[in-house]
């Protein structure tokens, strides 16, 4: 399913790049095309040094008929839709590939076969049209697109998605990880439970995850294990316990109680770790990003926690919370302005490219 977002649907970014970023070039008119293919979404975005900064975001997401994401099937999907998604992005903003100043691509972290599709296409475009190739870390891109749209200069970051659960903050030229999942990510927990319990797909119903929908009917939460180890979280035991209770549930109310218990434990644990990071760093803002950041329930919990500590909380538009090409284009633009490019021959994908090893030259 293809989705196309433009400034009219994304809204106006609240951040001013001249204040958020320590790089020049904002007086020039520069366009960067970004390609995202780290998991189930093939996305293309175009970013500019001029307002509204994000010109377009086009996504085509692979939805397996059953089970989770198979890397090779996702890669086949990406290869099949790539050319049309790229053309849609260019046509929407009235540009040709020759108008683009650089091509950015997410080189990791992610699923190897899926990553390689995006990397191969980006290399081909850069080499054939003589454009600089810009490497982008997928996790950094989630943070930077959120900073642009929220305008938060120095937040504690809660990055939650299907493949990542990380609490981080910026210090000394890098995003430092305060806590993370020890096993599966928050989004993976929710999706796997819903799938194995037989209540998904679809995973999202009227803007809410199906687990959140299921939980609405509960009178009280089921008792489930809460695991926070220092600053890290663990969800595999929670998943096993929740599925065990689900199979024993004799009524719809008991099933709803399992959903509510799962949600409260999962969301509560990531909010607790974020709260500890906020108290430690004494920062004045919390920023939620990643696919699970689209959850209004998690948003409310984060906002309440931040408010208790006299901090503000914010997040990007839902269309930019999950995987998208716009965040790759924007972070690619920042890298390009900072002079970071890569030779085609050196542009290897990095499936386990950690957030905290990436130097951030624009802050």
Curated annotation (Swiss-Prot):
Any single Pfam family the record assigns to this protein: TsaD
Subcellular location(s) per record: Cytoplasm
Binding positions (Fe cation): 138, 142, 159, 323
Names of the cofactor(s): Fe(2+)
Biological process according to GO: tRNA threonylcarbamoyladenosine modification
Annotated substrate binding sites: 159-163, 191, 212, 295
Alphabetical list of InterPro entries matching this protein: ATPase_NBD, Gcp-like_dom, KAE1/TsaD, Kae1_archaea_euk, Peptidase_M22_CS
Catalytic activity reported: L-threonylcarbamoyladenylate + adenosine(37) in tRNA = N(6)-L-threonylcarbamoyladenosine(37) in tRNA + AMP + H(+)
Alphabetical keyword list: Acyltransferase, Cytoplasm, Iron, Metal-binding, Transferase, tRNA processing
Highest taxon listed in the record's lineage: Archaea
Cofactor comment text: Binds 1 Fe(2+) ion per subunit.
Annotated EC: 2.3.1.234
Gene Ontology cellular component list: cytoplasm; EKC/KEOPS complex
Hydrolase as UniProt keyword: no
SUPFAM superfamilies (alphabetical): Actin-like ATPase domain (SSF53067)
GO MF term set: iron ion binding; N(6)-L-threonylcarbamoyladenine synthase activity
Enzyme class: transferase
HAMAP family named in the record: Kae1 (MF_01446)
Task performed by this protein: Required for the formation of a threonylcarbamoyl group on adenosine at position 37 (t(6)A37) in tRNAs that read codons beginning with adenine. Is probably involved in the transfer of the threonylcarbamoyl moiety of threonylcarbamoyl-AMP (TC-AMP) to the N6 group of A37.
Annotated family: Belongs to the KAE1 / TsaD family.
Name of the molecule in the record: tRNA N6-adenosine threonylcarbamoyltransferase
UniProt organism field: Hyperthermus butylicus (strain DSM 5456 / JCM 9403 / PLM1-5)
Top-level taxonomy: Archaea, Thermoproteota, Thermoprotei, Desulfurococcales, Pyrodictiaceae
Gene, per the UniProt record: kae1
């Amino acid at each position: 399913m293809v989705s196309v977002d433009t400034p009219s649907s994304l809204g106006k970014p609240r951040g001013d790049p001249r204040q958020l970023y320590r790089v020049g070039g904002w007086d020039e008119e520069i366009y960067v095309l970004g390609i995202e293919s780290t998991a189930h979404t093939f996305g293309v975005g175009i970013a500019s040094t001029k307002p509204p900064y994000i010109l377009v975001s086009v996504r085509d997401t692979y939805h397996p008929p059953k089970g989770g994401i198979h890397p090779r099937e996702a890669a086949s999907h990406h290869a099949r839709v790539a050319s049309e998604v790229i053309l849609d992005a260019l046509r929407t903003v009235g540009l040709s590939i020759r108008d683009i100043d650089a091509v950015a691509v997410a080189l990791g972290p992610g699923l190897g076969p899926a990553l390689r599709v995006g990397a191969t296409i980006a290399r081909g475009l850069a080499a054939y049209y003589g454009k600089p190739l810009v490497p982008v870390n997928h996790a950094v891109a989630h943070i930077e697109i959120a900073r642009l749209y929220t305008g938060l200069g120095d937040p504690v970051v809660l990055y939650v998605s299907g493949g990542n659960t990380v609490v981080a903050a910026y210090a000394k030229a890098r995003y430092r990880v305060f806590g993370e999942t020890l096993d599966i990510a928050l989004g993976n927990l929710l999706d796997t439970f819903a799938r194995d319990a037989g209540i998904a797909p679809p995973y999202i119903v009227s803007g809410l995850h199906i687990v959140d929908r299921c939980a609405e009917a509960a009178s009280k939460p089921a008792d489930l294990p809460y695991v926070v180890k220092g600053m890290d979280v663990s969800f595999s035991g929670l998943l096993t316990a929740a599925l065990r209770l689900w199979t024993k549930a004799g009524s719809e109310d008991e099933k709803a109680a399992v959903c509510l218990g799962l949600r409260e434990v999962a969301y509560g644990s990531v909010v607790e770790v974020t709260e500890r990071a906020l108290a430690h760093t004494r920062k004045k803002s919390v920023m939620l990003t990643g696919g699970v950041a689209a959850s209004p329930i998690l948003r409310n919990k984060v906002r309440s926690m931040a408010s208790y500590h006299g901090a503000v909380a914010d997040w990007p538009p839902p269309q930019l919370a999950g995987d998208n090409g716009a965040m790759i284009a924007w972070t690619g633009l920042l890298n390009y302005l900072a002079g970071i490019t890569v030779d085609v021959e050196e542009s290897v994908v990095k499936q386990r490219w950690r957030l905290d090893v990436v130097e951030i030259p624009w802050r």
